[in-house]
Amino acid sequence: MSENEIVPDEFRCNRSDGKQWRCKRRALEGKKMCESHHSQQSLKRSKQKVAESSKLVRSRRGGGDEVASSEIEPNESRIRSKRLGKSKRKRVMGEAEAMDEAVKKMKLKRGDLQLDLIRMVLKREVEKRKRLPNSNNKKKSNGGFSEFVGEELTRVLPNGIMAISPPSPTTSNVSSPCDVKVGEEPISMIKRRFRSKNIEPLPIGKMQVVPFKGDLVNGRKEKKMRCHWCGTRGFGDLISCLSCEREFFCIDCIEKRNKGSKEEVEKKCPVCRGSCRCKVCSVTNSGVTECKDSQSVRSDIDRVLHLHYAVCMLLPVLKEINAEHKVEVENDAEKKEGNPAEPQIHSSELTSDDRQPCSNGRDFAVVDLQRMCTRSSSVLRLNSDQDQSQESLSRKVGSVKCSNGIKSPKVCKRKEVKGCSNNLFLSLFPLELTSKLEISAEEVVSCYELPEILDKYSGCPFCIGMETQSSSSDSHLKEASKTREDGTGNFLYYPTVLDFHQNNLEHFQTHWSKGHPVIVRSVIKSGSSLNWDPVALFCHYLMNRNNKTGNTTDCMDWFEVEIGVKQFFLGSLRGKAETNTCQERLKLEGWLSSSLFKEQFPNHYAEILNILPISHYMDPKRGLLNIAANLPDTVQPPDFGPCLNISYRSGEEYAQPDSVKKLGFETCDMVDILLYVTETPVSTNQICRIRKLMKNIGRVRSKNPAKGRESRFDKGKKRDRLDDYSSSDSESSQHCLGAKCRGSEFEGEERESCNYSCEEESLSNTYGAQWDVFQKQDVSKLLEYIKNHSLELESMDSSKKKVSHPLLEQSYYLDEYHKARLKEEFDVEPWSFDQCVGEAVILPAGCPYQIRKNKSCVNAVLKFLSPEHVSESIKRVKELNQLPQSVKSKANKIEVKKMAIHKISEAVKEIRELTSSDSTGALRLYN
């Protein structure tokens, strides 16, 4: 083959440099390369060195084929070696001027971007060297890289600005420390830089966090374990929290503060639960004792909707109050010689001290207008009562303070008032105010679309199809009756507390507006460290009573204690007894008012407020739908709780009779939370401890008899609450009232001879109370049944006192026999259900109910006033006012009408403020 032969492209060797050059020799048959290149490729595959003689030399750009290296003249090889040597020397040179000259000699196009960038970098370095005279010294010390450190190079390009970040002098080929995770091996990332392919990355170890200086100083000191409360040291008596692994508590403080068992504290301490009340934790968690502020989370739109709902429910009550005002004024005008002119009406300026109930017991809940006699300094309270047959206008008279500040002992008689020429109407709420308030409330209601009001006797649309699933654990219905004609009335709403977390009250309000009770599950939070054991609570209270004798109330005015010992002799009556055993018995009934509950058990009191199932209705301070919340000074605040009810019975004879709450109803709404249920008998140590604490109280009272009498006199009214619960007392039991135990025969030697031992048993069933709840419309039938069977019911009641109103006085309890007779004669059947631990029973106002406790229970009771049942509450208060004074003194005085008027006024005012601040939000709300 001649060297000048032109080979077609399809037969040419495929060897090329990838750009322009390609071998012009002919490829071998069946191969893609020529003979020379094929042999070179074979040597490279076998990892052998290619001989210099077999390499081809490219021809210059003028043309010509490649020739072998053996054909090159010696002079030409020398020239080539000189050229290569010069290029190597130029690379070694570190001077920027020499590199700039070499670049200038390169024959490249002027539009080459890479060459332009290199030239720009070199120019910047030359200019920087001229500005910095000491650059040569820095270059020697830093190994030639100092001029690139700390400076950022930028280049303005047609489409933007390009920046070249400077390299790090120490870690030139390692990624940034921010890209390395703590405690893991870093990944070496080589930064792309000119002529830096062969530079090996510098080794780097695991990155670690250096401790803070304060931690290093504290770490040098030996960690000392101290009790979180008392600061006591010691390893043996301290219990460490496994949750935080930081707090320690001694055994004495745990027992003294009643913070649960050792296992509960070890699992999760009070600091972790947020129930610690020490100074440090109180400063950190200042808002723990307050009610949970659910309104802060609720949006303004939801708040306005709730206020609108309250106004819509209370507007009929306001209209009724204004109608009664109008009737009072018109009737009084007719009495004055037929003069139809409107009498002069003045607003009341009476303080809370002056607004006391009259001697005849007229409660201020129904007092709207008063007639004041200027001569006798008395007040004639007027109220329309259409139920009385004597007169269409009922007038009750009571004394108030005279101008000299002394109470008038005489009561202004009707004939004396009739002779008075200076009679003036005294209105606690001016008619102008209530009439304007009614107009404003109607305007608010017209802008709000209420949901469709269903018939009280119709079924709930949310519960359709759930009746068949009532037996399942996730059902929202609970079967409480089986023989009602209306199948939907056999079931009660049975939600969990989680169902109310998203302000989902529509389903609840559907059942609540019908007057049905609601049972809420899972109210008590899991993992609570508070101890609700009744014996422990009573002992804790007695200890506080001993420590603070002069400041606290008399404990026996709130507790009824019965202690007894029964001995058993087994064996021959004549001979020596083979076995001599005894059994301790304890009966404990107590009712703690809200003030005493908060004073003696602040942690338990705060826990009750935190676990309220529906805070919008039940929060006593911030409940948006609670009419009794956030009252002004002009309205007497009622004592709605929460209160604590303790019922404990131990021993064989005390386990047989049932402690019951007799049939009756409340004048307001109520929620009852079952906190604790036990069947564990009391131990001898607990009985001895109670006796010892009660003896200490009696010893202190004997020294200060005046304080004891004064305390019993002040709190004597509270003893009547214990009459609601009845139980059969055995002859061997000893009744202790007022810290003086009449059972003096229980000496220490006799107690030590008792070998009673008890073991705690796990309760398979956690229910402790059985409820029977009747409907509001069944009140008249219940009264008629009690009237017909009063002799049978009185035989069951040991008190045998005169009864004016069986339901208001809570005088009788209907057992299974009487409930069956009631169903047979009047077709009235209650909702009967069992209350388990952690369940809250929400009861509407006016619903008759009775409770039978099968076990020892501790429950909290809180009363509230919902807008749906204000009318029913007013009706029940009127019935209560017609009873004798002895009965009314037991009831909690509530001023329902005043609270309703104040709630409407505040709701209308707040709605206007919220809607006027954001006009767009108001438009979205109303449209």
UniProtKB/Swiss-Prot annotation:
Cofactor: record remark: Binds 1 Fe(2+) ion per subunit.
Biased composition (Basic residues): 80-91
Effect of deleting the gene: No visible phenotype. Decreased hypocotyl length. Delayed flowering associated with reduced FLOWERING LOCUS T (FT) and CONSTANS (CO) levels due to increased H3K9me1/2 level at CO locus.
Domain of life: Eukaryota
Any one GO molecular function term: sequence-specific DNA binding
Biased composition (Basic and acidic residues): 330-339
Domain (WRC) ranges: 7-52
GO biological process, any: transcription initiation-coupled chromatin remodeling
The entry's keywords: Developmental protein, Metal-binding, Nucleus, Oxidoreductase, Transcription, Transcription regulation, Zinc, Zinc-finger
SUPFAM superfamilies in the cross-refs: Clavaminate synthase-like
Compartments where found: Nucleus
Keyword Metal-binding appears in the UniProt entry: yes
InterPro entries the record matches: JHDM2-like (IPR045109), JmjC_dom (IPR003347), WRC_dom (IPR014977), Znf_RING (IPR001841)
Function: May function as histone H3 lysine demethylase and be involved in regulation of gene expression. Regulates flowering time by promoting CONSTANS (CO) and CONSTANS-LIKE genes (e.g. COL2 and COL5) expression via interaction with FBH transcription factors (FBH1, FBH2, FBH3 and FBH4) at their loci to remove H3K9me2 repressive histone marks. Also modulates the expression of several developmental genes such as MYB30, TFS1, AGL6 and RVE2.
Family label: Belongs to the JARID1 histone demethylase family.
Subunit (UniProt): Interacts with the FBH transcription factors FBH1, FBH2, FBH3 and FBH4.
Protein name: Lysine-specific demethylase JMJ28
Gene field: JMJ28
